[in-house]
A protein has these predicted regions:
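Bacterial Sec-dependent N-terminal signal peptides
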Residues: 1-11
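Alpha-carbonic anhydrase
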Residues: 2-4, 24-261
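Bacterial N-terminal signal peptides
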Residues: 11-22
Length: 261
């Protein structure tokens, strides 16, 4: 089942801001003197998001908020996600909340016969999701949105290990200036290189993990991908903690796939 992003809260332009640029409408307006800023600590931190702006209300009142601690998952007859990630020039921005890579149109996933184009991916340190109470060193979120406004997020847990070549390239091109998008046309990447070989997953109904915390369908890959301790440290120097705290499950069903390829 796909969960429709709350269009009552988000105009098409605002949805594009959240999913494509990795910022909220309020954050965009803040730069024009509008709605309040949010952060990961202090008076505008996660425990206060729902009170910062009426459009953030779901952060406080939503019953299917993310991230969650994934446990007691039910085995289910689920099909593999069909990934069709292609090459893209690197477009990267340090938006003040994370490092975000915007993706060239033409890449997508297919879930239950429906196509969801990939619009961006970004990183959190430590992981926002937990598996049986355990966090990973980091997590990568791929954000997809269909033509009719349904959103799917795919989380790939990142653990300390060998150096990751694609992350090395991304880190080497992080802009020094916040909120300045930089395109490196001669640097071509493929997001498929950040996927685990085993693509079994957990899936559940959830939300964006940043304001306005609107509904999103989540797929969390069961197998992590490695990056080096130095690569983790480099990101942590920029963002020591850009992870929303764990949210209540509120009786949500969590399913897990167990297919063999």
């Amino acid at each position: 089942m796909k969960i429709r992003v709350a269009v009552s809260q988000l105009s098409l332009a605002a949805l594009s801001a959240v999913l494509f640029f990795g910022i909220t409408p309020a954050f965009a307006q803040q730069h024009a003197g509008g709605a309040p800023h949010w952060s990961y600590s202090g008076p505008d931190g996660p425990e206060h998001w729902g009170d910062l702006d009426p459009s953030y209300a779901s952060c406080k009142t939503g019953q299917r908020q993310s991230p969650i601690d994934i446990k007691d998952a039910e085995p289910a007859d689920l099909k593999p996600i069909q990934f069709d990630y292609k090459l893209s020039p690197m477009k990267i921005v340090n938006n003040g909340h994370t490092i975000l890579v915007k993706y060239e149109p033409g890449s997508s996933i297919t879930v239950d016969g429906k196509q969801y184009p990939l619009v961006q991916f970004h990183f959190h340190h430590p992981s926002e999701e937990e598996i049986n109470g355990q966090k990973s060193d980091m997590v990568l979120h791929f954000v997809h949105v269909s033509a009719d406004g349904h959103a799917i997020a795919i989380a790939v847990l990142l653990k300390s290990g060998g150096e990751n070549p694609l992350i090395r390239d991304i880190w080497a091109h992080i802009p020094k200036e916040v909120d300045k998008e930089v395109e490196f046309k001669k640097v071509v990447i493929n997001a498929a290189d950040l996927l685990p070989a085993d693509q079994n997953y957990y899936t559940f109904d959830g939300s964006l993990t940043i304001p306005p915390c609107s509904d999103v369908k989540w797929f969390v890959m069961k197998t992590p991908v490695e990056l080096s301790p130095a690569q983790i440290a480099a990101f942590a120097k920029l963002y020591p903690d850009n992870a929303r705290p764990i949210q209540a499950t509120n009786g949500r069903k969590i399913q897990e796939s167990n297919f063999t390829e």
